[in-house]
Amino acid sequence: MFRVLNDDVYSPAEIQQQNPLAFGKASSLFTDNRSANDQCETGENVRESGQDHVKRPMNAFIVWSRERRRKVALENPQMQNSEISKQLGYEWKRLTDAEKRPFFEEAQRLLAVHRDKYPGYKYRPRRKTKRQQKLLPADSSKQCKQMHIETLQPFTYRYGCANTTGSRMESQLSLSQSVTITNSFFQNEHHSSWTNLGHNRVTLATQISADFPFYQSLQPGLSCAYFQY
């Protein structure tokens, strides 16, 4: 058993004889690419886009809170950064104008230095990445599908006779048969005589019976259609 394991161990010379190209590529990572290894060890960023970003000049509150934040963090190591920010904002509001004046003067000095150093500076805030929409849980999606299926009421056609399933369809079909559609009413809305309407009446039942051969020509036997309420 130990002999088999020892046979699998190869020296670098044997690896070079079997696959000299692979050995050369592996060795070049440590010899020819020293600059990349140095950057990884030192943590330098290869991209130069971050170096082009210019920070905004500090305002009076930031000048004051920079030192105050450190003291609060040292005094309360368990306090979160958000809680520290709330406390600093509360303390800053309680300061008088005389106490804030030195920090406003320092902020004005930093602003003048910033303008001299970056004359064409314009504040361009970074765009925040859009958060991905949370997916609905599987249970809610199933309930939506069930609700959609329940609203569909099927009925079938058989040899020119309408056979409906469900009391709702039967009641609505009986009501729809009594409703009439008149062509002359749409052609002339202001027609005063209702005597000529009887000649142009077309009931819904006759329209359904006229459409039965079309459904029978599509598929022999029974064909099922779904109506949504």
From Swiss-Prot:
InterPro entries: HMG_box_dom, HMG_box_dom_sf, SRY, SRY-related_HMG-box_TF-like. Acetylation of Lys-130 contributes to its nuclear localization and enhances its interaction with KPNB1. Deacetylated by HDAC3. It holds the Pfam family HMG_box. Gene3D superfamilies: High mobility group box domain (1.10.30.10). It comes from the Eukaryota. It is found in: Nucleus speckle; Cytoplasm; Nucleus. The keyword Chaperone does not apply. GO terms for molecular function: calmodulin binding; DNA-binding transcription activator activity, RNA polymerase II-specific; RNA polymerase II cis-regulatory region sequence-specific DNA binding. Keywords: Acetylation, Activator, Calmodulin-binding, Cytoplasm, Differentiation, DNA-binding, Nucleus, Repressor, Sexual differentiation, Transcription, Transcription regulation. SUPFAM superfamilies: HMG-box. GO terms for cellular component: cytoplasm; nuclear speck; nucleus. GO terms for biological process: cell differentiation; male sex determination; sex differentiation. Residues 54-122 bind DNA. Transcriptional regulator that controls a genetic switch in male development. It is necessary and sufficient for initiating male sex determination by directing the development of supporting cell precursors (pre-Sertoli cells) as Sertoli rather than granulosa cells. Involved in different aspects of gene regulation including promoter activation or repression. Binds to the DNA consensus sequence 5'-[AT]AACAA[AT]-3'. SRY HMG box recognizes DNA by partial intercalation in the minor groove and promotes DNA bending. Also involved in pre-mRNA splicing. Interacts with CALM, EP300, HDAC3, KPNB1, ZNF208 isoform KRAB-O, PARP1, SLC9A3R2 and WT1. The interaction with EP300 modulates its DNA-binding activity. The interaction with KPNB1 is sensitive to dissociation by Ran in the GTP-bound form. Interaction with PARP1 impaired its DNA-binding activity. Belongs to the SRY family. This is Sex-determining region Y protein. It comes from Cervus nippon (Sika deer). The lineage of its organism: Eukaryota, Metazoa, Chordata, Craniata, Vertebrata.
